[in-house]
């Protein structure tokens, strides 16, 4: 994602003749810095592509509050987006484009190919260890095929291989940092307390690193944290 999001942001801006000041996520600064080095090698004039590595409250705020910045494009959390929009409005009313996290459910109907549906939903949730703004973490299944879908989903989750992502055959690596690791574990606990049924996973995988077992709940209340 660091490389993809950088391309999505740089491409349109540069194609329209703009210069870019890009702040990377503090967890993944190296990709953007390397791309900037390649851009320099390719002959981009100095000052056209500018990369800032830092934290949101300092480096990010400097961009969103700056009077000479005409447009801000932000990908991240809804909470941070509020801060970005407020800073943009209070400074020079700069335009803002946002790509934020969502929790839209996937829907499986009774006439679906269940094996295909299970594989699709599995990928939709666990892709990139669930660290995706459109991760399908909720699934609504029509009543007639609910039990079979749940059974197949649990079987697939239990087969998912967890470990070093640089090892061949491994499907799931660690979460990116302590904050994400703790957030997921906290949501698992909230799921248990809500009355949802924990069918597999639900705890740390191994004794080191930010690994979490592939986790599946069923009978999730609609008003619970993990169900809403």
Curated annotation (Swiss-Prot):
It comes from the Eukaryota. Its EC number is 1.2.1.3. The lineage of its organism: Eukaryota, Metazoa, Chordata, Tunicata, Ascidiacea. PROSITE patterns: ALDEHYDE_DEHYDR_CYS, ALDEHYDE_DEHYDR_GLU. This is Aldehyde dehydrogenase 9. NAD(+) binds at residues 76-81. InterPro entries: Ald_DH/histidinol_DH (IPR016161), Ald_DH_C (IPR016163), Ald_DH_CS_CYS (IPR016160), Ald_DH_CS_GLU (IPR029510), Ald_DH_N (IPR016162), Aldehyde_DH_dom (IPR015590). One of its GO terms (biological process) is ethanol catabolic process. Pathway: Alcohol metabolism; ethanol degradation; acetate from ethanol: step 2/2. It catalyses: an aldehyde + NAD(+) + H2O = a carboxylate + NADH + 2 H(+). The active site is at residues 99, 132. GO terms for molecular function: aldehyde dehydrogenase (NAD+) activity. Belongs to the aldehyde dehydrogenase family. SUPFAM superfamilies: ALDH-like. The gene is ALDH9. Keywords: NAD, Oxidoreductase. The keyword Hydrolase does not apply.
